[in-house]
Structure formats: C-alpha cells, structure tokens
C-alpha cells in the first residue's frame, strides 16, 4: 500500500521543482577556499557555521577516535538503512550506527534508530566485544570534548551578536588563541549548555569506490553526493550539531586543491552549505580533511541546508546531536503503556481483560497508545532485523517487555469490541465508542498491511540475514494465544457496515 506524502513533503518537493525550473540549464554559483571571496562570504552569510581544523584537536583524541571507527567497522556494526521517502523504500548509500544515552532513539526519514549505549555513569551495558565497549567509551569522550568546544563557539557567537561585530573567526586553526568570552547570566549560560547537550551521535561510513551510483548535486554542479541536501531532523530547536570527519587517506596522500581545477576537488570530501531556497547567495563547498570538525550553531540547521559531497577515499563521521527525545525514550514509551493499561480492571488466565471505563476519551487514548507502541517502537525495531545484537543485547529485554504490554492492549481492544457488540448497550453509547476507536482501528489495519508489504519487498530480501526485516508482531489467524486477528479488515468492515450512518470520514 503506497503511503500518501505528507503536506510538508509535498511542499518541499514543489519548492525543489520550482527551483530547478528557475535554474533551467544553468548552475547556481558556489565558492571554495580557492575563491578570493570565500571567507568573506562565509563570514557574512554563514556566520553560524564554524570549522575547527584537525590541528586544533588533541592528537591523542584523533588516534582514539580513528581507532574506534575502524574497530566498529571491523565488527560489522555499520548498517545501511532501509528508509521510507515519499512512499518508497530506499537503501541509504551511507552505513550508520547510533550511539548515545541508554534508552534514547533518533528518528530520520521515517526510521527510528535505537542507541547502542555509551557507558554513562550509573548504567550497565553488556557489549558483544571488548573492542565495541572501548569504541563506545571513546565516542562518549569525543562527545564531551565537542560539547566543550560547542559551548565555547556559542559563547563567541553570543558575544559577537551582543557587540554587533564581525570579528569571530569561522575557521579556527591550531594556533588560534582561546580567550575568555566574558560573563553570562545564569539563564544564558544554562541555555547555551542545553543547546550543546549532545545525547546521541549518528556515526556514518561510506566507501565511494564501492557505490556503483551516487546522485549528482542538482543546483550548483558540485559533483557526486554521499548525502543529498537536507536539514537534520528530530533535533531540539536551535540546538547545535557537531561533526568529526575522518577520511581514510594518510596525511601524505591528501590532495591539495589544484588552482587550475574549476570548482571543488572531486577527490576530496566536502560539506556543502546553502541558504534554503535562496538562488542569490552563493553556496559553499568546504573541504574536509582527516580529523576536521565543523559545528552548526543556533538556527543554522533550520535556515540552511547541507549536503555531503563524496571524495575518493572511504570516510567516517561522528555527528553529535541534541535529539528531541520527548517522545523518543524507552522511559517515555513505558510510561505511555502504563497509562493505557490503567484502564484494565482484571486479566483472566486466558488473556481476557475487563475494563474500568468505556468512556470514549479513555478508549481513544488507549487505542492511540496501542498504535504508538506497535508502529513507532515494535515494528520499527524488528524492521531492522537483529542488527543491534551485533553490538549489545541492551534492547532485548525492553522489547520483550514492550511486546508483552502491547499484547495486553490487544486484549483491551478485544474487550472494547465485545462491549460494542453486547446486546443492551444504548445506541448513543455504542456510537460514541465507535466514533472514538474506528479511525484508529482503520489506521492500525492500513499500517499493518504497509509494514507487512515493506518486510516482503524485493529490496528487503536483498539484505544480509541478520539485517533482514522481520514483520513482528505477526501471527496466523487461528493463533489461540491472540484475542484478535492480525488482519483487521473483516472487523473494520463489520463495524463500518453495522454503523454505516456514522460520519467515519471525520
């Protein structure tokens, strides 16, 4: 079943088409460090983009981080994601792994990634290999370092804005003197720290030589893209993003820009920036050498788009983010499940439940949570196969727990349907219940069909065994352990037919 694009997706696609139409056969201008006006343009139009050159990062940290990347790669911990874009399943050219606070998730392109926990104080995590444990510890150390650097950069930016000056450098080399930025009141200081409170890092890997096809950058003619133009999703508003880049060539092999070459050097990895939907301001293509870091501060991620332009060597990156986790942690979804199940009075040995209330608002909330845990958590997790077991078993017990709570919610739905069908229920009460639940049951049926089809798709069948999508929860029609069938078509049709006078379209 093809998903209908959201209004936001349709608007974004329309903007893209309009921009391409305006361009016709011409390229927009962009600048590289070879251009005289490059740094001036960066300062004027991209002041919230900061580059820390590799020489300004401690050498021992470089060594640890680069070893950690290679260790995770050796253990097969990077995975290409089967993502959903405008109703189509696509395999990302970049392989990824999410590391971060225990129980956190990060959602992008309709895909929820689950953290391999880094070893924060008070948490106990069992890793499959000692090398994986050491790597997670290293990325926590890098996170702490980048957090300090980000706070410094945000303070510099705030001072610049307060003083109304343009003196803050956008590119900082190893000899740049780090000076105190003066005083901030408590609220300003807290705000800056919160905007740098990275709770996850999304690690990326790509070897361009093993990718038979990469898209060409469509607006500026910048060459092959590893990652298309985008805003990073699912972040706390105005929070920073910090990126550590590691391309695998040795320092002696790094290519210097050829002054005779027009545009960016295609052998070198770059990050591209442009102001969203602006065809007047030149874009930037910033070369990324081994160990360089860049920072997107304040609202830059909202007002600008960025892309990653492929070079020749394999490249890793660690992208540190303040993920918007208000609805994306294990604690959150467990609390939601408990809220839904507060309406259960008793549960019999055979799984039948009795409910405390048939108030429509209570039933609607329960069915909403039922859908949330099934489609935002269980199916998202199992769609990624057994990939997380390569690193840790941290999510195994929580997923078993969530599945048990979800199964109780199946019993709740069954109890609601029994009430709807019970003789003697006043027509008005029956209609109120149906108005509360039928749209949610219809959504559940449609999404189950969609997820089942995604798991069976041709592209899903090409994945390695440990990454093959699993349609879970799934059960056959005559499974005695389940109160309701997997396929709700007949139930939805029955309810619609029996109560067809209700305004279901609403």
Swiss-Prot record:
Gene3D superfamilies: Alpha-ketoglutarate-dependent dioxygenase AlkB-like, FTO C-terminal domain. It catalyses: a 5'-end (N(7)-methyl 5'-triphosphoguanosine)-(N(6),2'-O-dimethyladenosine) in mRNA + 2-oxoglutarate + O2 = a 5'-end (N(7)-methyl 5'-triphosphoguanosine)-(2'-O-methyladenosine) in mRNA + formaldehyde + succinate + CO2; an N(6)-methyladenosine in mRNA + 2-oxoglutarate + O2 = an adenosine in mRNA + formaldehyde + succinate + CO2; N(6)-methyladenosine in U6 snRNA + 2-oxoglutarate + O2 = adenosine in U6 snRNA + formaldehyde + succinate + CO2; a 5'-end (N(7)-methyl 5'-triphosphoguanosine)-(N(6),2'-O-dimethyladenosine) in U6 snRNA + 2-oxoglutarate + O2 = a 5'-end (N(7)-methyl 5'-triphosphoguanosine)-(2'-O-methyladenosine) in U6 snRNA + formaldehyde + succinate + CO2. The modification N6-acetyllysine is found at residue 215. Keywords: Acetylation, Cytoplasm, Dioxygenase, Iron, Metal-binding, Nucleus, Oxidoreductase, Phosphoprotein, Transferase. GO terms for cellular component: cytoplasm; nuclear speck. It is an enzyme of class 1 (oxidoreductase). InterPro entries: AlkB-like_sf, FTO, FTO_C, FTO_C_sf, FTO_cat_dom. Substrate binds at residues 96, 108, 230-233. Residues 212-223 are annotated as: Loop L1. Its cofactor is Fe(2+). Residues 32-326 are annotated as: Fe2OG dioxygenase domain. GO terms for biological process: DNA alkylation repair; regulation of multicellular organism growth; RNA repair. Binds 1 Fe(2+) ion per subunit. It is found in: Nucleus; Nucleus speckle; Cytoplasm. RNA demethylase that mediates oxidative demethylation of different RNA species, such as mRNAs, tRNAs and snRNAs, and acts as a regulator of fat mass, adipogenesis and energy homeostasis. Specifically demethylates N(6)-methyladenosine (m6A) RNA, the most prevalent internal modification of messenger RNA (mRNA) in higher eukaryotes. M6A demethylation by FTO affects mRNA expression and stability. Also able to demethylate m6A in U6 small nuclear RNA (snRNA). Belongs to the fto family. Monomer. May also exist as homodimer. This is Alpha-ketoglutarate-dependent dioxygenase FTO.
């Amino acid at each position: 079943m093809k998903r209908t694009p959201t209004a936001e997706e349709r608007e974004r696609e329309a903007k893209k088409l309009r921009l391409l139409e305006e361009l016709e056969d011409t390229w927009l201008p962009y600048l590289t460090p070879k251009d005289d006006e490059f740094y001036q343009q960066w300062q004027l139009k991209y002041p919230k983009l900061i580059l820390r050159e590799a020489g300004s990062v401690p050498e021992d940290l470089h060594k640890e981080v680069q070893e950690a990347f290679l260790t995770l790669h050796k253990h097969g911990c990077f995975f290409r994601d089967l993502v959903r874009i405008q109703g189509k399943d696509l395999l990302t050219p970049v392989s990824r792994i999410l590391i971060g606070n225990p129980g956190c998730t990060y959602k992008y392109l309709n895909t929820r990634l689950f953290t391999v926990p880094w070893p924060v104080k008070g948490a106990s995590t069992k890793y499959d290999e000692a090398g994986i444990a050491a790597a997670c510890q290293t990325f926590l150390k890098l996170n702490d370092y980048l957090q300090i650097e980000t706070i410094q950069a945000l303070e510099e930016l705030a001072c610049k804005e307060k003083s109304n000056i343009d003196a803050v450098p956008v590119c900082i080399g190893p000899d740049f003197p780090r000076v105190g930025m003066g005083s901030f009141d408590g609220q300003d200081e807290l705000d800056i720290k919160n905007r740098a409170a990275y709770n996850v890092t999304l690690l990326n890997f790509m070897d361009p030589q093993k990718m038979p096809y990469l898209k060409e950058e469509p607006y500026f003619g910048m060459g092959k893209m590893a990652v298309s133009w985008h805003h990073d999703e699912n972040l706390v508003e105005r929070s920073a993003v910090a990126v550590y880049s590691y391309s695998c060539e040795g320092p002696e092999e790094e290519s210097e820009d050829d002054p005779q070459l027009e545009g960016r050097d295609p052998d070198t990895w770059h990050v591209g920036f442009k102001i969203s939907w602006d065809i007047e301001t030149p874009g930037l293509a910033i070369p990324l050498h081994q160990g360089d870091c860049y920072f997107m501060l304040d609202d830059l991620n909202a007002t600008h788009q960025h892309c990653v332009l492929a070079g020749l060597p394999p490249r890793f990156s660690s992208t540190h983010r303040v993920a918007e986790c208000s609805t994306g942690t294990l604690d959150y979804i467990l609390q939601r499940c408990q809220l839904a199940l507060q309406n259960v009075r008793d549960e019999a040995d055979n799984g039948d439940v009795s409910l405390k209330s048939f108030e429509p608002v209570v039933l609607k909330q329960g069915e909403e949570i039922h859908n949330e845990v099934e489609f935002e958590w269980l199916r998202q997790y199992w769609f990624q196969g057994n990939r997380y077991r390569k690193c840790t078993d941290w999510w195994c017990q929580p997923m078993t727990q969530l599945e048990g709570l979800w199964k109780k919610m199946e019993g709740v739905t069954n109890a609601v349907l029994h009430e709807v069908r019970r003789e003697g229920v006043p027509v008005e009460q029956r209609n109120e219940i149906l108005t509360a639940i039928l749209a949610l049951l219809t959504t559940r049926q449609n999404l189950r069909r969609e997820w089942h089809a995604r798991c069976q798709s041709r592209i899903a069948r090409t994945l390695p065994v440990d990454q093959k999508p699993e349609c879970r929860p799934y059960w056959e029609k005559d499974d005695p352990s389940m109160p309701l069938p997997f396929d709700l078509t007949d139930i939805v049709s029955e309810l619609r037919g029996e109560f067809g006078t209700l305004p279901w379209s609403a």
